[in-house]
């Protein structure tokens, strides 16, 4: 009892401190002498994102165009279309990512690709001219694809290319594009029995073309013939034009990729012995000038075109009207 009383009295006894010795700290003492250091994270600013992060996010979206889900691919294409970049160098990667989707099995994905391609061409003028080699390769492949749905939507992409880069198509891919129309419409270029049976076999193996799809194909064929066989008329504007010296073009960089093609140094552009182009010689011909394209149509394609278009006119309806319009273009070409 006396021991406990002594321990309680110790709590009220004032300790005698020696000189220079600090007071003992209690057991529950918390040290507050430290100073916090600030942490700076400039790349994680909420107010404004850095351009590098934006570009990384955009490239990540482009990688999702290869996603296994068609719904994801469609939504990614919509997102890219709604926020196209201002940096022109990124459009090459956009085309490299979306053009393989021309062969996509989903119709909704192909429609989004067409919409995005149209928007890219409108945003960056000259984009399709610059990348015409890779773009037209996928379009021609789609026009001869084994799946009917992909063939049916292929001319939508060709229509976009013709709207923005018809001159590039006419100069470098006139013959291949025109032959692709014969493939997609199951037309025959020759009248011999062997070619006719081959055309019938090919048509049955790849499946027939629906009436709605044929209307679209003929409409694009009409645009193709008009844009490649006739000179474009200059649009009249009210903006004053400054006079340019007529010799200026001789000192400027050429606008076409083959400025010396007219000299026929590396191509065979001369007709055969009978002064007629043949189907076998089309692959080695250059179609840079308008007269060569017109002569190719006159010598090789005009007769089978008229024959097949006349058969479609007899069907009537929208197909007949579009076919008649194409025949009108051939008549204009014949009279010019």
Curated annotation (Swiss-Prot):
Cellular component GO terms, alphabetical: cytosol; nucleoplasm; rixosome complex
Keyword flag Phosphoprotein: no
Gene Ontology MF terms in the entry: chromatin binding
Localization in the cell: Nucleus
Purpose of the protein: Component of the RIX1 complex required for processing of ITS2 sequences from 35S pre-rRNA.
Family statement: Belongs to the IPI1/TEX10 family.
Name of this protein: Pre-rRNA-processing protein IPI1
Originating gene: IPI1
